Amino acid sequence: MNKSNKKREGGLPTAVVLAAASFALNFGLIPQAIAATIGGTVIEDTIEDTPESTIESTPKTSPKKATKISPQSAQLTIAFNIPSQPLESGLVAFSQQADINIIGVTAILREHRVAVLKGDLTKAEALDRLLQGTGLSYEMINDTAVSIFVKAPVPEAPDEVPLLQEIIITATGRATDLQKTPIAVSAFDQTRLDFAGATDLRALSYMVPGLEMTNTAPQAATLVQLRGVGSTNITEIADGPVSIHVDGIYSPRSQAAVTLLYDVDRIEVLRGPQGTLRGRNSSSGSINIYNQQPLLDVVEGNLSVGYGNYDRREYRGALNLPVSDTFGLRFAGATLRHDAYTDLLDNYQGLGPDYPATSDELTAFDQALDYGQSAPEMADKYSWRLSSLWQPTEQFSAFTSLERYRDQGAGLAQLAPDLVAKGIRAVVSDSPSFLDLTNTVLRTKLDYRATDFTLSYLYGKSQMDRQQIVDADNGRSSSFEQQRTHSSNFKFSSHELQLMNDDTERLRWLLGGFFSREKNEIVFAVDQQNAGGERNADGATSWISDFEGAAVSYAIQPDRRVESMGLFSQLTYDLDRFSRFTVGARYTNDSKSDRGGRAINCRVTSVLGSYVGPDSIGPGAPSPEDIYADAATQQAINAGSFHDNGTSEGIGDQPCWIRQVNDLKITWENVSGLLRYDYRPSDDLMYFATVSTGFKSGHIQDAGNHVAPETVTNFEVGFKAQYLDDRLRLNGALFHANYNDLQFSNEDRLDINFDGIADTGGSTVVRNASAATIQGLELELDWVMTDVDQMQLTAAFTHAHFDQFEIPDTLFGDLFNPYVSNQSVSPEDPVVLSGNSPPRVPDWKLTLSYSHNFIFDRGVLTPRVVLKASDSYYLDIYNRDTLAPGIFDSLPNGGSDLGVQKSYQLLDLSLSYKPAAKNWMVGAYIHNAANKDIKVDSGNALSSAGLVATYMEPRTYQLKFSYLFDEN
């Protein structure tokens, strides 16, 4: 039995133990009873969060000085019996039972509730309890009258240290303060994103604890991972465990969701299972992007221009136009272009001992030298968005946005680590990388707000088209190979209906229903070069086929569908003034189908596997259009039989054949739930405890195979606190997640010579790990140290491993080289991965930033330093680290860190200047200032310094100018 379960030695750093101890100490402050007894009177209260804006129209000054009250009246106790009810009617009951008149504000009384008030109390004691936490105060005018008024704000000292700003989010489906929301959530507005120099979602990887986001070469997709769990399958029907929503609309494909960040209102990243409200495929978390909506009362806009190295050019802007008092428009757009981070070479000769000039194994075919802008890692993308807001009445509003995104970059490249270590960021490519992706999205939200409830409808529709070429062998193989998305089309639509009651009710409920449909079609091809390496007349690479678009292997998926239906509800009940209980549940019905999907091979090799010269097969393999050229061919494809459509001489009578028939339809059902208790002993401190379950849809794949859904049960406790007079914010969460049928992908085995022995690696397949356990601690700190100094810290300490995970040996008895051929391995001899760590899960990772404002008469100069540090992590499920000498001829001395990224530190620097009383700002930004080489994903080709890998961007810098304007 093969084993690959090596683990790094040592436990978590001391910082983890100290942080956990601090966490437990804080949590121990919770009293065992949440009732206050005063003179034998038990007061059970409920707390309500009321935004300050709701009381602006009320008086903010106290009435005339009160008349003296008789001592007898002041000490007189009254037997009060006031049930829980709105504050307005509660004060009426108080007035009747105390025989006293109430004078003052009434506008906001309905927005608060009183809890049960029983027992013998003085009038003052009763009023203290009734008005606690409402922002209201009172003054006794005389024995028979009392005045209720809004507390006057305390004037701020001119030189007082600034306070942390309140952050309003909608993580619970309602607008709440971040610090009063019992969820592990991080939130950022556009100002914070600009301050960090963020241009796309990947920047959040160092701003959110436990979040990893990186691009990958195939499929132009982004790998999103939260709390140690992500998706390595990026095909046309794959699902990830981190859902992405834009303006409340679910985005099923990461290629369509991870676009440019511009004109953003806020981003909320929710950690842990969020399936109750966020729906399918949010078993480890949810990322929610909310763009700016039109304003109805002001003409305003912004513009920014940035220039940097690698000929970086970045433009962003937005314009808000109120057409009338009830209708407004907003237009925003962004572009980003830069040259390639990676150089293209003719061949690897002369670059070192691993690449000798005489090596047939590592010498590539000659290639066309003029690639223009098609070199790896260049960027050419733009996006625009037109949105409207119609608000004819105070009760109804309609928000609509139309967005288009296009990416014409060149994709990524997998680089040889030994070359990167020498400062050579270069690759040999037999085919220039190519990408053309467009995504068009329509989003609509309708809201109707009645007196006691709000009804919302959300509709989304999108279409994504993509063509792409990826060099599969990086020029390292004499059997040139490229992966080509000949065509693809992804159509998605969704409907969601939500009904919720008023925010001021003691029992707050939310009901909803969701339905979505996705239809995808794709033609994916694998091309190979002529065995002799001939070129066409124009110098371009010569293919086996003379037909444009022809290939040696196709995955033709004309109709892959996903349908999802969900019903959900969430209830929150205020137990008393200090604590509340939340329960939620969601029913999900997911259906996936493949109609007419076929994997087709066209013979370009002999039965023994040697390559056939181009002259022996005539015109060569057919193009996808040729394959479907006539009814007989279509009938053969549908039947899954061998066929010859007459476009090739072939070898024998069968130039092309169907390798796999993919027809399948399967449905999964799930009920996921949420139980949460939160306790707030003061306005500055909250604790919460949560038990939640999550569900990630099952997966269908080629040959009619499928894997089970992924489920998780998560246990979590957390706290949110503000100290130092609201100048220091500290939030933390401790979690333990048990996963069943955790989904991971690896390469399948193929039998290409029909001898019954699997002899080469093949397409990526998804498999279920029986079980996995992930636990960790997350901390976020935001500290206004002085009036000119500010610091932020995010930290994640994670321990993750597979409890039970065995897979077929797709590596042919060798854990370090997936492409070793001609070795027979029994299916009963699996690779045991139990105890291994999932990819890209460091034991700890933190980001520390510090900024200082130098204040001058003419403006403010702000330097900022950001330190990012991470422990080491593996890049694949095999946890491949050290290779002993003598195993492979190509690596006689062995190797180390084959599939590992060592621990590292990164440094980002910025300097910005904002003039006083002006609407412009200029800033300089440097990312990865020390130019560190950081692996984010791995491939399969082997070098002495490790497997080929995708790397983080090198050092980049830019100068950026921003301007804000409005009609005032």
Name every feature range the model reports, one short phrase each.
Residues E300, Y307-A410, T438-T444, K491, ...:
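Transmembrane beta-barrel wall of Gram-negative outer-membrane proteins
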Residues M500, L510, R577, F581, ...:
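Gram-negative outer-membrane beta-barrel transporters
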Residues G39-I69, L91-A93, F149-D194:
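Short, acidic, small-residue-rich periplasmic hinge/interaction motif at the N-terminus
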Residues N738-N740, S745, K868-P885, S912-N968:
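C-terminal beta-signal and adjacent terminal beta-strands/loops
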Residues S147-I148, L201, L223-Q225, H245, ...:
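N-terminal periplasmic accessory domains that precede
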Residues I234-T235, V242, D247-P273:
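Short acidic/polar hinge/loop motifs at secondary-structure boundaries
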Residues E166-I167, K445-V470, D678-G694, A708-A796, ...:
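Membrane-embedded beta-barrel scaffold of Gram-negative outer-membrane proteins
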Residues L389-E394, L499-D502, F514-S516, P558-A737:
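Structural signature of Gram-negative outer-membrane beta-barrels, strongest in the C-terminal barrel
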